[in-house]
């Protein structure tokens, strides 16, 4: 077991963060991470997120805030977790009111209401 009770190695966490980063840049969907790493933990997922955010910040993005997701019990159940999750919001994730949102910026766009 690695630090922070994570089941994935630091190298694997870094590789996954880079895969996600490349997928965003190429706009190509990748295979669900948990299918390749069924032992992944919540701690691993947050470690991957931190590495991915670091990659973005190193490219010039700016951390603007945080978000909470999966706040409903139904969404938590569908994701097989028992608590809300959280994530970082970077400057390139915001759009001005009334502006057009470039659909080609996203791989599989969805709207959460």
Show the residue positions of the predicted features.
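Active-site microenvironments in enzyme catalytic cores
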Residues: 8-113
